[in-house]
Amino acid sequence: MTIVERARVFATAAHAAVGQVRKYTFEPYIVHPTEVAGIVATVPHTDVMVAAAYLHDTVEDTGVSIVDIQKEFGNEVAALVSWLTDVSRPEDGNRAVRKARDREHIAMAPAAAQTVKLADLIANSRSIMAHDPAFAKIYLEEKRMLLEVLTRGDATLMARARSIVGE
């Protein structure tokens, strides 16, 4: 199996093991990482980036650690997943404070991580706009602030993201 196939299988199992489903649609959670990986694959990318796209929520949402990712997929994938993992915790403060901390973290990330983050933003924004228009107003403002720091991400995805969030 390729690293991308291994990442897809691993992420599918990790999210299923905790019973995670997509908010609003209740589909198996892997639908989201699959969409993110598919978006990454539409622009210049590496297999490491696509693997990280599949794995980007495993550390935040499942029992998987960065060490587990490193052991299974190596340092490059683990580094990208680490950049893509939110660093804020509930005790850091309200949502605005937490999102600011997470923006500061991803602002320092390399181009590959920021490209995956743009794909994640595109996928999540479309879903939230379709299923929760009231929350979308708050969410899209947060994403507009996030776009300000994703300066190293892929330009094509940046343009798509800006179009979606209404910038």
PLM feature spans:
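Active-site helical microenvironments for divalent-metal-assisted chemistry
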Residues: 1-167
